[in-house]
C-alpha cells in the first residue's frame, strides 16, 4: 500500500486550525443580540466592535506575512491559535463594552490574523508543487467547516444555555485541541520530514526560493493586476465576512424566522460553502481563475437579490444554498492568480496584502450596514449597495489579462 504523503497531513492540520480559529471569528453574528441585551448597547456599537476587529485583523496581515518569512508558518499558526483561544475564553469575565473592544477587537483579532490563510498558504506552496489548487481548496474549506459547525453550534449553545458558556467552550477547543495539534504536527518544509513536496523538489525550490527582483514593492503597487485583484477582494470581504457573517443572523431574526430556521440556513450556507471552495480549487487547476472569479461575483450578486425578497423560509434557504456555493469560493482562484502574477515576490507578503484588502472590506461591511440599519430600521439599502459592488468586481475580473500573457510581457521587458 502506498504511504500517505505528509503534505496531506499538513493540509489537514491547517484545515483544522482554520475551522476552529476562523469559526470563532465567523460566530460573531451569534453574539450580536445577546451582547445588545447584556450591555444595553445598540446595533451600531456592536457593529463597531466587529469593525475594530476587522481593522486589527487587516492591518496585521502584511506583518504576518513578514513574520512567516522570518519565523515560519508553524510557529505563527500555533501561537496565534493559542492567543485566539485565551482571548475568547476571557470574554467570559467581561462586564462592560470597552472590555469587549479590548478582548475581541484586539486579542481575538490578532490571533485570528495570525492563524489565517496567509501562513496557511505558505505551507501549501511549500508542500505542493502540483495539485496546488486542490490543496488551497481543502485548506480554505476550513472556513466553511467552521462556519457550518461553530456558527450554528454557538447559536444553539446560546439558545439553550448562555453566551458565557459558549465562549468557554470555544476557548477550550482552541487551547486544548488545536494549539497542541498545530505545535506537534505542522512542519514548515518537506525537508523537515526528509521528503519532497508533492510534484517534486525542483519545482518547489523554484517557487519558494527567496524572491529577488529588480522591481521594488512600490513597483508592485503600480501594476494594474495588483489593484484589479485587491479591489474585488475588498468587495468580497464587504459582502461575505462583513455583511453576511455579522448581519445575516440578526436579519433573519428581524424577519421573524425562528432560531431553528436561522440555524438551518447558516448550516446550509456553510455546507455549500465547503462544496464551493473545494470545487473552485479543483477548477482553478484546470481553467482560467480570472473567468471563475467573474462568474462567482455575478452569482453572489444574484443570491443577494433573492435574500431581499426572502419573506418565507424556503427563500431564505434557497439564498443560503446559492450564496454558500460562491461564499469563500473566490479565495483559491484569487490566490492562484496572485502566485501567477507576482512570482518575483514573497508569497506571504502578497497574500498578506490581499488579506488586508479583504479585512478592510470586512470592516466596512460590518459597520456600514449596521449604521444603515440603525438609521432606516432595515438592511435593504445595504443589500442593494452590495449588489452594485459585486457587479463592479465581476467586471474588473473580465478586464484582467491572463497570467501567461502578463508573464510573457514581463520576460520581454527583462530581456531588453
Curated annotation (Swiss-Prot):
GO terms for cellular component: plasma membrane. It is found in: Cell membrane. The chain crosses the membrane at residues 4-24, 45-65, 75-95, 100-120, 141-161, 165-185, 226-246, 264-284, 304-324, 347-367, 380-400. CDD domains: MFS_YcxA_like. Its main location: membrane. It is a multi-pass membrane protein. Pfam families: MFS_1. GO terms for molecular function: transmembrane transporter activity. InterPro entries: MFS, MFS_dom, MFS_trans_sf, Proton-linked_MCT. Keywords: Cell membrane, Membrane, Transmembrane, Transmembrane helix, Transport. The keyword Heme does not apply. Belongs to the major facilitator superfamily. This is Uncharacterized MFS-type transporter YbfB. The gene is ybfB.
Amino acid at each position: 500500500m502506498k504511504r500517505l504523503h505528509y503534505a496531506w497531513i499538513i493540509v489537514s492540520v491547517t484545515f483544522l486550525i482554520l475551522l476552529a480559529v476562523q469559526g470563532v471569528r465567523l460566530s460573531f453574528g451569534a453574539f450580536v443580540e445577546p451582547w445588545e441585551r447584556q450591555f444595553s448597547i445598540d446595533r451600531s456599537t456592536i457593529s463597531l466592535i466587529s469593525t475594530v476587529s476587522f481593522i486589527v485583523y487587516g492591518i496585521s496581515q502584511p506583518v504576518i506575512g513578514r513574520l512567516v518569512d522570518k519565523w515560519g508558518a508553524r510557529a505563527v499558526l500555533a501561537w496565534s491559535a493559542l492567543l485566539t483561544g485565551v482571548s475568547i475564553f476571557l470574554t467570559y469575565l467581561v462586564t462592560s463594552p470597552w472590555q469587549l473592544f479590548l478582548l475581541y477587537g484586539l486579542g481575538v483579532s490578532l490571533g485570528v490574523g495570525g492563524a489565517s490563510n496567509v501562513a496557511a498558504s505558505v505551507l501549501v506552496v511549500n508542500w505542493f508543487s502540483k495539485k496546488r489548487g486542490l490543496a488551497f481548496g481543502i485548506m480554505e474549506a476550513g472556513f466553511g467547516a467552521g462556519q457550518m459547525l461553530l456558527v450554528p453550534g454557538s447559536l444553539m449553545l446560546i439558545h439553550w444555555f448562555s453566551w458565557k458558556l459558549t465562549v468557554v467552550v470555544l476557548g477550550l477547543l482552541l487551547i486544548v485541541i488545536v494549539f497542541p495539534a498545530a505545535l506537534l504536527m505542522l512542519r514548515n518544509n518537506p525537508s523537515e520530514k526528509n521528503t519532497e513536496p508533492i510534484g517534486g523538489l525542483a519545482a518547489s525550490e523554484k517557487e519558494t526560493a527567496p524572491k529577488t527582483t529588480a522591481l521594488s514593492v512600490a513597483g508592485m503597487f503600480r501594476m494594474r493586476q495588483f489593484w484589479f485583484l485587491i479591489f474585488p477582494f475588498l468587495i468580497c470581504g464587504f459582502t461575505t465576512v462583513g455583511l453576511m457573517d455579522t448581519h445575516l443572523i440578526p436579519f433573519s431574526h428581524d424577519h421573524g424566522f425562528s432560531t431553528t430556521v436561522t440555524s438551518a440556513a447558516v448550516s446550509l450556507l456553510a455546507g455549500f460553502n465547503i462544496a464551493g471552495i473545494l470545487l473552485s480549487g479543483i477548477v482553478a487547476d484546470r481553467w482560467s481563475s480570472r473567468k471563475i472569479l467573474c462568474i462567482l461575483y455575478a452569482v453572489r450578486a444574484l443570491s443577494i437579490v433573492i435574500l431581499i425578497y426572502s419573506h418565507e423560509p424556503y427563500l431564505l434557504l434557497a439564498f443560503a444554498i446559492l450564496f454558500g456555493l460562491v461564499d469563500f469560493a473566490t479565495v483559491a482562484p484569487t490566490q492562484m492568480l496572485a502566485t501567477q502574477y507576482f512570482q518575483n515576490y514573497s508569497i506571504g507578503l502578497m497574500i498578506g496584502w490581499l488579506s488586508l484588502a479583504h479585512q478592510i472590506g470586512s470592516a466596512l461591511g460590518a459597520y456600514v450596514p449596521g449604521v444603515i440599519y440603525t438609521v432606516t430600521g432595515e438592511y435593504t439599502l445595504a443589500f442593494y449597495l452590495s449588489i452594485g459592488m459585486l457587479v463592479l468586481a465581476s467586471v474588473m475580473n473580465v478586464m484582467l489579462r491572463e497570467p501567461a500573457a502578463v508573464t510573457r510581457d514581463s520576460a520581454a521587458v527583462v530581456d531588453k
